[in-house]
């Protein structure tokens, strides 16, 4: 530490003072008893909340509380001792730990994973009828993601002029997939955000072609940039995904063949593919913002406030889901009881 720098003081965050912690501490046991009796539908077909959901709430109530454990730290410069409460490191309930995970994940991917090349975000949403199975069956979720990644790879191979005559088996993409289980209004909405290097990597013998532009500096790899990825390109990608995903659901016995054919004919199919966001190679700050967006937690403490006996959650977007709320909620707000808030959060806790 320099002689002129002012030392920073460690201030415990005191989660017990936050509105969310107070609501969970006061109402969680009541919700757990009612949910186990089938009074809430946030847990799907299983009335009793799953063990990982109960564990997430239990850990959250201990996170940052000194009574549940702490570490003693000592400053090597001044010799001052201070205590740091243990954190839960949870992924679904704790706003502090999920925000820290978001920041650390984005920084790591930006600094150590993504090369200095253009990165495009691909987003896939599917109809609610299919989301039901994806939300409850990890194998189905993985199946849809694999199909999505294969179609992205085929699209980039086709639109990378430098790789037009290459063997497709030797061309690969670089991608990080984020599975979102939530929508902007604390609703269940499983969909994918995939950040993909905008082009393909070619495996070559030795050091590769020194004249290739641009080129990754790793031995045996050449990068071929993609061009012409626009709305006209994405439209057939969406059609291809729609056909392949429905065919896969039929093959698994999750859809009848006649239902899949009907869904192919819908004007508004519920399938949506977007690839409009592309970050230039030099704009690392924008890339980190995109990665934070993709790794963000399901809800924000800053959007939650209390009005009388009710909780009001301000949604990031105007709600599209139907509602029977007669409490005067605005289109971009949710009016919830503490039990309803806990139930919504519980439904968004990701499985281990």
What are these regions (language model features)?
Residues 1-352:
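Beta->alpha loop/short-helix hinge microenvironment recognizer with preference
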């Amino acid at each position: 530490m320099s002689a002129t720098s002012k030392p920073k003081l460690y201030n415990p965050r005191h989660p017990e003072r936050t509105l969310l912690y107070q609501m969970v501490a006061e109402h969680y046991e009541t919700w757990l008893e009612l949910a186990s009796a089938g009074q809430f539908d946030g847990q799907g077909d299983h009335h009793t909340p799953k063990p990982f959901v109960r564990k997430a709430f239990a850990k959250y109530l201990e996170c940052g509380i000194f009574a549940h454990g702490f570490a003693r730290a000592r400053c090597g410069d001044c010799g001052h001792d201070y205590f740091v409460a243990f954190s839960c490191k949870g992924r679904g309930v704790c706003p502090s730990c999920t925000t820290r995970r978001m920041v650390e994940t984005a920084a790591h991917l930006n600094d150590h994973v993504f090369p200095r090349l253009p990165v495009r975000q691909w987003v896939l949403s599917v109809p609610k009828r299919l989301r039901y199975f994806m939300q409850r069956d990890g194998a189905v979720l993985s199946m849809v993601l694999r199909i999505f990644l294969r179609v992205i790879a085929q699209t980039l191979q086709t639109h990378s002029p430098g790789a037009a005559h290459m063997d497709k088996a030797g061309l690969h993409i670089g991608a990080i997939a984020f599975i979102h289980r939530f929508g902007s209004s604390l609703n269940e909405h499983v969909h994918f955000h995939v950040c993909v290097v905008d082009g393909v990597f070619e495996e070559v013998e030795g050091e590769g072609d020194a004249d290739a532009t641009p080129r990754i500096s790793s031995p045996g790899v050449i990068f071929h940039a993609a061009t012409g990825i626009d709305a006209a390109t994405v439209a057939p990608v969406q059609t291809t995904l729609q056909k392949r995903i429905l065919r896969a659901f039929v093959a698994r016995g999750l859809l009848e063949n006649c239902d899949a054919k009907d869904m192919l004919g819908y004007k508004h199919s519920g399938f949506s593919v977007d690839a409009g966001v592309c970050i230039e190679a030099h704009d690392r700050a924008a890339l980190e913002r995109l990665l934070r967006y993709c790794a963000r937690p399901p809800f924000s403490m800053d959007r939650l406030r209390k009005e009388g006996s009710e909780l009001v959650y301000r949604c990031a977007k105007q709600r599209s889901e139907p509602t029977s709320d007669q409490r005067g909620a605005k289109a971009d707000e949710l009016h919830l009881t503490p039990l309803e808030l806990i139930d919504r959060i519980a439904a968004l806790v990701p499985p281990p």
